[in-house]
Regions:
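N-terminal cap/lid segment of alpha/beta-hydrolase-fold proteins
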Residues: 77-129, 133-135
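Mobile cap/lid helix-loop segments that gate and shape the active-site cleft of serine hydrolases
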Residues: 213, 217-220, 235, 275-318, ...
């Protein structure tokens, strides 16, 4: 038998079976159902039962510092067991270095856990430090092939496929690498791959449809993939603070989309962070998980911390960062986040900052833009950090 022809026939047969299965599934719809558009039909009843009893103003804790400790403890509790700390520190290795215009770029490998090492990019301005620093947190975008390379221009040591992919993705930032922009303006910049992105992805390739399956399997170990992302961001910031080129009292974080989610989570949970700027990720669960809108960002496993919603909503978690300076920019044309949810979240946070006499430290802005991180947003973030770091 001709083996190449046999292999081709098997591939064709597999495709036909897959397609027929999809068609059959579409034809097998039942008259009665309980789920639609990835949500239960009783979604609004679930939302009505959410009272967020640990939120500031809902909780019976009246001392703000005591509330922050209790709220932070609850978040960590819902994040499950953290990855075990490395036994011998970060064991950082410089894999490659190149000089850029006004700053050096390094590729590193650092140990964030006894389980694993993590690749990272580090940009250091020329001149005498120490400098203020920013942990730039990459986005999701349903694009897992690259991570840190979305926000820092890939070094020359990277494969040409990675470089080409990053050059295409940076158009979401209007062609400017966010991290390089900050480095040119005097900031040390650091960025790592989140779990499942870039060099922390799957051997079989960056298949988005496998993300949820892997996240579910992680839960079977009693751990949480989204939580690991946040735990890593906290430890990566600890590493950043340890560098001699960095002024450890002037560290901020920023990101777009999932990077924005990572930003306010990190700002809330790490005392290392002195200021945070989040672009296009803030909403309330009431508007995020309802069937009232044709399309919303349900989040999925990328921001799933089991049980936490029974205690705190997104803006309540972000408010643990109070009274730190925080900037939130959302888009009025962002199809992922309903405007009502953005505005309600902003109002909740303003109430918290105002209650602590720190109203001037919280800046929330709703721009006439879609889900994007344009040059003017990056300029706004730079001005914010120049003011507060």
């Amino acid at each position: 038998m001709n083996k190449p022809k046999t292999k081709t026939c098997l591939v064709i047969l597999s495709i036909l079976l897959m397609c027929s299965g999809q068609v059959l599934a579409q034809q097998q719809g039942r008259e009665k159902y309980e789920f639609t558009r990835n949500l239960p039909v009783y979604a609004d009843s679930l939302i009505a039962d959410l009272t967020y009893p640990l939120a500031w103003g809902h909780s019976d804790i009246r001392d703000f510092d005591a509330w922050k400790r209790a709220a932070r403890e609850k978040v960590f509790d819902c994040m499950f067991t953290p990855p075990p700390a490395p036994a011998n520190g970060f064991e950082a290795k410089v894999l490659y270095e190149e000089q850029r215009e006004g700053y050096k770029a390094r590729k590193l490998e650092i140990r964030l856990s006894r389980y694993y090492t993590v690749p990272a990019y580090l940009l250091i301005p020329d001149g005498k430090g120490p400098f203020p620093a920013v942990n730039v947190l990459h986005d999701h975008g349903a694009h897992l092939f690259i991570g840190k390379e979305k926000v820092i221009r890939p070094l020359a040591c990277e494969d040409s496929v990675v470089i080409k992919d990053a050059e295409a993705w940076v158009q979401n930032y209007e062609g400017q690498y966010f991290g390089d922009y900050l480095a040119r303006n005097g900031f040390v910049v650091f960025s790592t791959d989140a779990p499942m992105w870039g060099e922390r992805g799957q051997k079989e390739g960056p298949r988005r449809d496998r993300y949820d399956m892997i996240a579910g399997n992680m839960m079977m170990y009693g751990i949480d993939l989204s939580a690991y992302m946040t735990y890593d961001d906290i430890r990566a910031t600890d590493y950043l603070a340890s560098l001699p080129e960095v002024d450890s009292k002037r560290i901020g974080c920023t990101g777009w989309s999932m990077g924005a989610y990572r930003t306010w989570m990190l700002s809330a949970l790490s005392d290392r962070i002195k200021a945070g700027a989040a672009v296009c990720w803030m909403v309330t669960t009431d508007e995020q998980l309802t069937l009232h809108y044709s399309r919303t960002e349900n989040g999925g496993f990328a921001n799933c911390l089991p049980g936490l919603r029974r205690w705190l909503d997104y803006p309540h978690i972000a408010s643990i960062a109070c009274p730190k300076p925080m900037l939130f920019i959302n888009g009025s044309k962002d199809k992922l986040f309903p405007v009502a949810g953005e505005q309600n979240a902003f109002a909740i946070m303003h109430d918290v900052w105002e209650s602590q006499g720190a109203g001037d430290n919280l800046e929330t802005e709703l721009w006439d833009m879609p889900h994007s991180c344009p040059l003017r947003a990056q300029e706004r973030v730079l001005a914010f950090f120049q003011r507060f770091l």
